[in-house]
Design a protein with these regions (language model features):
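Nucleic-acid nuclease catalytic cores
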Residues: 156, 186-198
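Structural motif
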Residues: 170-174, 191-194
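Hydrophobic beta-strand segments of well-ordered beta-sheets in folded domains
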Residues: 165-168, 185-189
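Active-site-adjacent loop/helix micro-motif of nuclease/hydrolase catalytic cores
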Residues: 125, 174-183, 198-199
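Accessory nucleic acid-recognition modules appended to NTPase machines
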Residues: 4-155
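Domain-level recognition of nuclease-like catalytic cores that cleave nucleotide substrates
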Residues: 195-211
Length: 211
């Protein structure tokens, strides 16, 4: 997953993580300040702390009170605003309930890192890595196509993801079945370690061509 998405592909792991950290700093200290010039040094510090908390936990269903405490943020509104800004910066992906949800005001159903590369700041769980890869590819597809207000992938009550508010996806390994989504129309399984899909079971790597 990392190699398929690398923008720099270094041979040296130390260089990889150093470059990764530099890109994160540029996104927060440069890009965000250009977009939101009213952000001050304390806000930037809190946003960095919030991202470090998220990196240690993703993907996860956020508890607002726990995130506020961990990132030393006083109120819900500020936390949701900082989360939305990290999403704007392309560092995290807020998975909302549906297209009517507003990232700056509503609680996200789940938080992902926007790119699987960021997961390599710690030892990633393979299941989390698969889901993050899937979210990354679909999210970039919708943004590049400028479809559905740049947001076409949502949390699903039955499967893992709900795309275009029509297609339900479960993401898993080669032996992942349809138990959770067997009675749902337009439902699919995206399977890792699968060379060629069959029927409604799609090889996960295929989604890499959407980027």
């Amino acid at each position: 997953y990392r190699i398929r998405n690398d923008p720099f592909l270094p041979d040296n792991e130390v260089l990889f993580f150093h470059t990764l950290q530099q890109n994160i700093n540029v996104s927060i200290e440069g890009d965000l300040l250009n977009i939101y010039p009213k952000l001050n040094g304390n806000s930037i510090k809190k946003i960095k702390l919030l991202l470090s908390v998220i990196i240690k936990s993703v993907p996860f269903e956020p508890k607002i009170s726990d995130l506020k405490k961990a990132a030393d943020i006083k109120d819900d509104r500020t936390l949701k605003d900082y989360l939305a800004k990290l999403d704007d910066a392309g560092l995290i992906k807020l998975l909302m309930q549906n297209s009517l949800s507003m990232k700056a005001f509503d609680k996200p159903e789940k938080i992902f890192l926007a790119n699987p590369n960021l997961m390599y700041t710690k030892e990633p769980n393979i299941g989390n890595l698969r889901e993050t890869f899937f979210v990354n590819q679909l999210d970039n597809y919708y943004k590049n196509k400028q479809l559905l207000n740049d947001d076409g992938i949502f949390a699903s009550k039955n499967g893992d993801f709900y795309c275009e508010e029509k297609y339900t996806f479960e993401v898993g390994g080669k032996n992942k079945g349809f138990e959770q989504i067997k009675d749902i129309p337009n439902s699919y399984v995206a399977s890792d370690d699968l060379e060629i899909g069959i029927g409604n079971k799609i090889a996960l790597w295929i989604f890499g061509f959407l980027y």
